[in-house]
Amino acid sequence: MTEAKKSLKRTLIGKVVSDKRAKTVTVLVERRVKHELYGKIVSLSSKYHAHDEKGEYHTGDVIEITESRPISKTKNWVVTRLVEKAAAV
């Protein structure tokens, strides 16, 4: 009865494509799926708005986001960790 609760929140890994808004980053998540009829591998992508409280993530960073309560009309995700820093130009 004292088992640890399993997290039911989804986590995704994606690339930051915009950091222009205050405390918000736009994350592009790409996934590859096999077409049901033809069998070809197809790349699908989705953009998510994630909450970045400190403003520490910038364009090009690869980050992990976790599902959360609605923060605003379009923001339901929170940045949890940095996976890979963007290369300096």
UniProtKB/Swiss-Prot annotation:
GO terms for biological process: translation. It comes from the Bacteria. GO terms for cellular component: cytosolic small ribosomal subunit. InterPro entries: NA-bd_OB-fold, Ribosomal_uS17, Ribosomal_uS17_bact/chlr, Ribosomal_uS17_CS. Gene3D superfamilies: Nucleic acid-binding proteins (2.40.50.140). GO terms for molecular function: rRNA binding; structural constituent of ribosome. Keywords: Ribonucleoprotein, Ribosomal protein, RNA-binding, rRNA-binding. The keyword Ribonucleoprotein applies. PROSITE patterns: RIBOSOMAL_S17. Part of the 30S ribosomal subunit. One of the primary rRNA binding proteins, it binds specifically to the 5'-end of 16S ribosomal RNA. Belongs to the universal ribosomal protein uS17 family. PANTHER family: 40S RIBOSOMAL PROTEIN S11 FAMILY MEMBER, SMALL RIBOSOMAL SUBUNIT PROTEIN US17M. This is Small ribosomal subunit protein uS17. The gene is rpsQ.
